[in-house]
Amino acid sequence: MKQSLTLVFLVAIGYATAYTTSHDYSGGYGGGCYGSDCDSGYGDSGYGGGCTGGDCGGGYGGGYGGGCSGGDCGNYGGGYGGDCNGGDCGNYGGGYGGGNGGGCSGGNCGGGFDEAFPAPYGGDYGNGGNGFGKGGSKGNNYGKGYGGGSGKGKGGGKGGKGGKGGTYKPSHYGGGY
């Protein structure tokens, strides 16, 4: 019995190690991620670095303080304080990311929608809050509401023009949409 438990334990450790390795938490909590695919959980540049490449998606990619540049910066890409530049800066990327500190430039800097974070602060809220540029082209149907209104209240400057609204895109962890 003891041998069986030991074997199960070792297999579990091996699986956990393989899973973590395969998901490549590159950059961790402070580094940068550069390449065609930086996708992985808390990796991608973590909480302080920048993410540059074709796909910087996955979890908190782009981090809470860095910039996100590339084709797809995924969930939380762009972070809470950095810039988001590229074709798709994903959920919250360019939202709070383009909002409380940085800018959002690209084809889609709109915010996503997450049940845990029901207020969909997209590029509209972000750029409005900082008083420069118009809101992102897609605010997931909430652009007009949060663009100018929240911008004037929080940014000090002139609120950005609200986005025209867009299609609802649910949040998902592990990559951009």
Swiss-Prot record:
Location of the region described as 5 X approximate tandem repeats in the Swiss-Prot/TrEMBL record: 25-112
The keyword Repeat is assigned to this record: yes
Region of interest (Disordered), ranges: 149-177
Alphabetical keyword list: Repeat, Signal
Sequence repeat placement: 25-41, 42-59, 60-75, 76-91, 92-112
Repeat as UniProt keyword: yes
Biased composition (Gly residues): 149-166
Signal peptide extent: 1-18
Name of the protein in question: Eggshell protein
Species for this entry: Schistosoma mansoni
